[in-house]
């Protein structure tokens, strides 16, 4: 079974590019990362930074998660991210996404030993 840490990497890490390559980026990535297999995942964020830099956020600014849990951490610096949001015309299995490039602080939930990101909570 896929670990929570591995799932985070599959769903949210794209270190190979510094930003979204085109307006079609989300359509391609959401499909290739299996985020449209059983349904269209409505919203998803990809982070264009090294895995080490994203894992390091787990020792940065401790903040409350959206659900009230206390194991969320905000990055000290802004990171290059791409937000993928389902469009109004999107219909499973033909999931369609709008690609939005940004530089923001990320907030991730961390757990385990080693203490690593397992959930992408927000960007600010």
Curated annotation (Swiss-Prot):
It is an enzyme of class 4 (lyase). SMART domains: RNAse_Pc. CDD domains: RNase_A_canonical (cd06265). SUPFAM superfamilies: RNase A-like (SSF54076). Its EC number is 4.6.1.18. It comes from the Eukaryota. One of its GO terms (molecular function) is ribonuclease A activity. GO terms for cellular component: extracellular region. Keywords: Disulfide bond, Endonuclease, Glycoprotein, Hydrolase, Lyase, Nuclease, Secreted. Residues 1-24 are annotated as: Disordered. Belongs to the pancreatic ribonuclease family. Monomer. Interacts with and forms tight 1:1 complexes with RNH1. Dimerization of two such complexes may occur. Interaction with RNH1 inhibits this protein. This is Ribonuclease pancreatic. The lineage of its organism: Eukaryota, Metazoa, Chordata, Craniata, Vertebrata.
